[in-house]
Structures are given as structure tokens and as C-alpha cells.
Amino acid sequence: MHSIFKKGHPEAPVFVLLHGTTGGDETSLLPIAQELNKQATVLSIRGDVSENGMNRYFKRLAEGHYDLEDLEKRGEALHKFIQQAANEHQFSLDKIIFIGYSNGANIAIQLLLTHPDSYHQAVLYHPMFPVELTNQPDLTDTSVLLSLGEHDPIVPLPESMRVIQLFQNHGATVQEVWTQSHQLTYQEIKETQTWLAHLSS
């Protein structure tokens, strides 16, 4: 997998950046990470699936219909890659905060659900997860900030509500931020800064 690593302050969090689909790559969220915490360690990973020349983290069968077998396979591969990076760069999985946008937020959800003992915190911008769970993970140690669009052209409102319920039903601590559409906004960055400050207090 292609990635960028930047060592930060040992007491600061580790941001694992997972980009969106449209033109996204491992550089896309770096300015946002810098805005959120200049001292954070950063691991930014490019999705290794190409759809019409655009980078994704897993295949889909159609808009809103995921290839579930590929989602599981790519999720496990990403988990192993993060484990290897943690060993190589000597940081703890406990310090990881996923910063995921759109497709990147979706693969982050997969990791939070399948490895709740490894990952506990995430900022998820405009996620959608139309998946029936085969397991019932215990997410009582998980905290997520969900940033959702009231008029998102990609994620219908019922799908945003489904993500909220997914985390709440499995015991996670959930904070919601509501915006208008699918693009990232300055409001979301400010809300994320506040959430991160509360998380570390």
C-alpha cells in the first residue's frame, strides 16, 4: 500500500488518514490533519482499489452496494498494514484516531467493527455502511464523531441515520455534526478540533 508517515510528538495522537474517492489519495487529508493537531503522528494511506481511475479502499457492485467479500478482505489487509506500520514506527494502536472521509470513513467503520480491541476512536466524515452485521461487536470503549449531511447527494438521510444507530446500538459514544452536503467544510474542522480537545481532556 502507498502511504505517507510523519512522526509527531510521542504524547500526541496518531491520525490514520483515509481519503475519499473522487480524486483522493494519501495527500488529500494532510492539510486537515495539520489543522487538527500539528503535533500528531500521521499515517496517511492510499486506497489500493481503482474504480475508473479513482482510488478506493474496497470494491462496490454499484452506488451504495458494496462487494462484502472484498470489503472484508481489504479491511483485514488494511488492519495488517496498520499493525506493520505501528511495529515499524513504534507507535501504539491505542493512540490511533481514524480520520476518514466518505469511502475512507466506510473502511474505518469496517475496522472499528471487526477489531474493537485495537481501534477505539474515529472521526467519520459522511460515511455510509449499508451492511447487515454477522457479528455483534462490543463498542463500549469506542468514541466516534460522525459528520453527516442533511442534503447529501451521495449518502441519503436514512443511511446517515443507519450509521448513527449502528454505533449507538453497539454501545459506542457518538457525537453528531450535521452539515448541508457531502463536501468537507470549515465548520466540520472546527467541530472536530473541539471533539479532539474533549477527547484528550
Question: Residue spans of the language-model regions?
Answer:
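A conserved short beta-strand
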Residues: 117-129
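Conserved alpha/beta-hydrolase "acid-adjacent" motif
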Residues: 153-159
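Serine-hydrolase catalytic machinery in alpha/beta-hydrolase-like enzymes
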Residues: 1-91
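Gly/Ala-rich beta-loop-alpha elbow adjacent to hydrolase catalytic centers
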Residues: 99-104, 108
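Conserved alpha/beta-hydrolase "nucleophile elbow" surrounding the catalytic nucleophile
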Residues: 19, 100-101, 149
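Short beta-strand/loop motif that positions the catalytic acidic residue
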Residues: 145-148, 152
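C-terminal catalytic histidine-bearing segment of alpha/beta-hydrolase fold enzymes
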Residues: 161-164, 168, 172-201
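Alpha/beta-hydrolase fold nucleophile elbow
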Residues: 90-100
